[in-house]
Curated annotation (Swiss-Prot):
Pfam families: Ribosomal_L22 (PF00237). This protein binds specifically to 23S rRNA. Keywords: Chloroplast, Plastid, Ribonucleoprotein, Ribosomal protein, RNA-binding, rRNA-binding. GO terms for cellular component: chloroplast; large ribosomal subunit. This is Large ribosomal subunit protein uL22c. It is found in: Plastid, Chloroplast.
Length: 142
């Protein structure tokens, strides 16, 4: 899955949620706001956004951070949301009964969400640079 010339500044930690009962379009609207943010900043943004997609995404970020802490012993304060993907999952097909024996089709979409966190070392990393954004400063790769 990963290329041989991976120049990431630290280890990657991933968490995957499959078959989440929401459309991928609605999840992408939330995901685009937290891409590139630090762990604490991403959770703060998700708490304040008024969308239903924020709850499963914040659970997934908590899970990825817990994986980083438990499996690799990393500090949660040094984590960065480096890559986030939302893919469409299977569509559940249902039928809404209507008058005179008819049935209208109902499609219930699902999505798969992948979150990759990276550890950043802010003191001696020439690959990272500070970038000013509306919500404060964010560490990004050059």
């Amino acid at each position: 899955m990963e290329s041989m010339g991976n120049n990431s500044p630290g280890p990657e930690i991933r968490a995957l949620a499959r078959n989440i009962r929401m459309s991928a379009h609605k999840a992408r609207k939330v995901i685009n706001q937290i891409r590139g943010c630090s762990y604490g900043q991403a959770l703060m943004i998700l708490e304040l956004m008024p969308y239903g997609a924020c709850y499963p995404i914040s659970q997934l970020i908590h899970s990825a951070a817990a994986n980083a802490n438990h499996n690799m012993g990393l500090n949660k304060a040094n984590l960065l949301v480096s890559r986030v993907e939302v893919n469409e999952g299977a569509v559940f097909k249902r039928v809404q009964p209507r008058a005179q024996g008819r049935g209208y089709p109902i499609q219930k979409p699902t999505c798969h969400i992948t979150i990759v966190l990276e550890e950043i070392s802010r003191s001696n990393d020439p690959i990272m640079s500070i970038e000013s954004r509306k919500r404060g400063y964010v560490w990004r790769r050059k």
